[in-house]
């Protein structure tokens, strides 16, 4: 009769009494099930007639005066019999419709995941052997690293190169310096012969978490945070905070985000692993933007298509790798840079 349960009803099978919150209807010359189904069909009307504030109620007088269509008793019974014949089918089709609605809501995301999986396995487009080999890209990257080392822009340890190859026993091995390790168990699927498996760290000229900023109320130098990486894959500065101008010297140029930088949320339950790709267009009139310590920046060498890496990072197999390798407690998951460096990727020719 009142509250959130206005209109709720049932048929009693035992002797009992009710309190003031319930209205008992004892039918005379009315089939009780017919009355039950009529009241059930009228539930929304009862709710709309409820009066009051926090605890709306419907009075007994309104129920007594509620118009009731009265067919003959045998007709009441026939109506009930037909309803009880149809209700199981209605419930079944309601369940099917709910499942169909859920499928329609999810099909776009599932289709996207399937297409991404076909793409990273080299099955989405025909393979053309005249387009070169991924091995050439890796050789170019190693030459570029050597050049940067000679210019003093890389350390000697950065020259250590991971090479993944298939041995004569048809198993995959990784060579770093003089050490060779079988990694066959890490390989999730076969790739076209002109492709190569490699670690993400090999393909990046800059792979780092951002820094912990000191903020300012002056809206001049925005800081890219987790909230800027939207679930849709788009980026937004609507929730960005701003850097204290007095701390600018803390941020080297390499921390200033550039076109096609891949940005990965690296902490936080529910958002860790979320991926975006940066475009300077979102800066508007801001001179630059830097990432905070909850964001990892993946900046590839120029001969690697950043969008290809971005879509790889969005794929279900990479997202599962991220999920499986998170550290920290349930409430504060964390994705370490070392996990990203070791991320195994299939690399096609450019």
Predicted regions and their residues:
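Long, low-complexity segments enriched in small/aliphatic residues
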Residues: 148-149, 153-202
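Amphipathic alpha-helical segments
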Residues: 64-98, 196, 309, 342-350
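Sequence-specific dsDNA recognition surfaces
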Residues: 12-20, 24, 48, 176-186, ...
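Low-complexity, Lys/Gly-biased intrinsically disordered segments
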Residues: 5, 51, 154-158, 170, ...
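Short, ligand-facing micro-motifs at secondary-structure edges
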Residues: 1-18, 32-37, 44-53, 230-243, ...
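A short glycine-rich beta-alpha junction/loop motif
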Residues: 2, 16-23, 53-71, 211-212, ...
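Non-catalytic DNA-recognition/assembly elements of restriction-modification systems
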Residues: 77, 96-99, 105, 113-114, ...
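Short amphipathic coiled-coil heptad-repeat segments
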Residues: 82, 87-136, 146-147, 154-165
């Amino acid at each position: 009769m009142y509250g959130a349960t206005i209109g709720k009803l049932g048929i009693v099978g035992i002797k009992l009494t009710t309190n003031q919150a319930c209205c008992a209807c004892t039918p005379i010359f009315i089939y009780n099930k017919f009355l039950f189904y009529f009241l059930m069909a009228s539930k929304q009307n009862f709710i709309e007639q409820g009066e009051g504030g926090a605890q709306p109620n419907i009075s007994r007088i309104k129920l007594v005066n509620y118009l009731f269509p009265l067919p003959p008793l045998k007709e009441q019974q026939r109506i009930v019999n037909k309803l009880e014949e149809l209700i199981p089918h209605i419930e079944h089709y309601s369940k099917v419709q709910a499942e169909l609605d859920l499928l329609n809501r999810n099909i776009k995301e599932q289709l996207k995941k399937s297409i991404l999986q076909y793409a990273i396995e080299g099955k989405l487009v025909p393979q053309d052997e005249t387009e070169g080999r991924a091995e050439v890209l890796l050789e170019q990257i190693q030459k570029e690293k050597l050049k940067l080392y000679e210019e003093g822009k890389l350390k000697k340890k950065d020259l250590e190169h991971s090479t993944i190859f298939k041995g004569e026993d048809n198993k995959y091995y990784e060579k770093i310096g003089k050490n060779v390790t079988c990694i066959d168990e890490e390989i999730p699927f076969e790739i076209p012969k002109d492709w190569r498996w490699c670690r993400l760290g090999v393909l990046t000229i800059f792979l780092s978490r951002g820094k912990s900023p000191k903020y300012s109320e002056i809206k001049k130098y925005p800081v890219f945070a987790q909230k800027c990486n939207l679930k849709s894959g788009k980026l937004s500065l609507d929730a960005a905070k701003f850097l204290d101008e007095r701390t600018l010297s803390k941020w080297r140029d390499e921390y200033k985000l550039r076109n096609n930088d891949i940005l990965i949320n690296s902490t936080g339950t529910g958002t860790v692993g979320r991926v975006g790709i940066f475009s300077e267009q979102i800066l508007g009139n801001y001179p630059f933007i830097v990432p905070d310590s909850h964001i990892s920046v993946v900046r590839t060498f120029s001969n690697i298509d950043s969008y290809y890496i971005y879509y790889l990072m969005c794929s279900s197999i990479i997202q599962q790798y991220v999920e499986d390798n998170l550290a920290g407690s349930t409430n504060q998951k964390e994705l370490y840079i070392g996990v990203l460096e070791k991320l195994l990727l299939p690399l096609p020719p450019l």
